[in-house]
UniProtKB/Swiss-Prot annotation:
This is Putative cysteine ligase BshC. It comes from Koribacter versatilis (strain Ellin345). InterPro entries: Bacillithiol_biosynth_BshC, CC_BshC, Rossmann-like_BshC. Belongs to the BshC family. Residues 431-451 form a coiled coil. It comes from the Bacteria. NCBIfam families: thiol_BshC (TIGR03998). Its EC number is 6.-.-.-.
Amino acid sequence: MIPDCIPLAEVPHTTRLFADYLAHSAKLQAFYPALKYNQNLAAYTSSIQYQPGTRDRVATALQILNERLGASPEALANIERLRRGAYAVVSGQQVGLFGGPLLAVLKAAHAVRLARDLTAQGTDTIPVFWMASEDHDLAEVDHVFLPKNDFSLQRFTADATGTTGAPMSDLRFEPTIENLVQQTSELLGDSSLVDILRESYRPGETVAGAFGKLFARLFAKHGLVLLDPADTELHRIAAPLFRRAVAEAAEIARALVDRGKELEHAGYHEQVKVSASSVLLFGIQDGARVAIQRQNDHFSVGKEKLTQEELLARIDAEPEKFNANVLLRPVMQDTLLPTLAYIGGPAEVAYFAQGSVVYERLLGRATPILPRFSATLIEPKVEKLLEKYDLKFEDINHGADALAEKLAQKTLPPELDEQFRVALATVTQTMAQAKDALAKVDASLVEAAERATSKMRYQVGRLHRRAARAALRRTHVLSQHADLIVNALYPEKELQERTVGAAYFLAKYGLDLVDTLVDAAGTCPEHRVIRV
């Protein structure tokens, strides 16, 4: 039986940096100044400098935004708590179609759970979800994958209209979105979730706005506060940060280049390529997001050249025409919010290693970052097959063909399977005895004996696999079972949470599944298995 909590070392695609971060490796301390606070977030409150005037302005902006998204009384009450002095736990994600992959809901659930726990422990904290509405890559968010009856995935793609390269806060769904919701309902069946999709995803609604309305409903009782960084008032509050990103661009770029070298020297790599001309801002020109580069004493904004004074004046006049890149975004977040912790995935954890120099220069501190809630949901039909074949989580992560072969091995005639087991044991035992005898004759022969043992074990195992493939050819049932298990738990050779739309689970198991995920979020520090 697969355990409820799986070490991330057994989970595919875990990078060295992320594994070291989970292990609290001492060599990462220089890259994560706030790592020491991860086990005691309340102690970090003394590091947060947050002006009452900023608190009030941000709370008012969040109130207006969340009311527009249909916020619950619980969410609006949390905004008032922020106004009165509460801290924030923040997570965020791209505004994927119909809520995007499962991991977006997992992140929000983790923020809710952590804020709840911190408040219970005496540190008043609210959960905030940062919608990545300023991203401009529509191809990353215009689709969702939902499982069919055999758990193979069906892709649903939406049409959105607007300027090419425009942020998600400006792109609007075309009338075809109604047909897409109907197609989704035909696959998922009628449910409360589908009703919410119909109300949220309507012609003319922005990509970010529809996502926000959906999440406002999903997390209504939990008081999740949604933040749209494209909001004009939030840009006005962040304008001084944007000014410093320009005025100190040369020093920031130099610090980032040096940090990249330090990461490489430590055996890691930088997530974002930075050069001496890099500026951590984008500009908006003709509705599209364009990079800003520094060239000696001038700056290029797309094809336009400006002096530093001209660029700073433009930021003062129209701060909403600028937004932060991936390294400045967390600093903007923590300029706007009294952030006690950010909950991020492996890539975000890696960004923090590089971006902490930006934090320290522009904010005077670095925010603690916690690995996000990671989980695989196992449905009853799949669970029965896992139990039938006595499978482990790692058995699933090599694709359907490898799993089918594994299943065939498990279903070989018991006497044949036992003979292979005995053969391996005999080879190992016999060669161990031979190795001991050889050591007395000539110690140099021990290594040769070990190589011979390895080759013989390989050949026995190879013959075992060939026997399994022969058995597999005689039945399609094992292949079907392997396909079903892999499609459900490791689709497209990715973790389920990164691929399967949360809408599938919420439609099938009800909106109360959100409560289950919130409760589960604090129970496993690595990868959680949840049986639904």
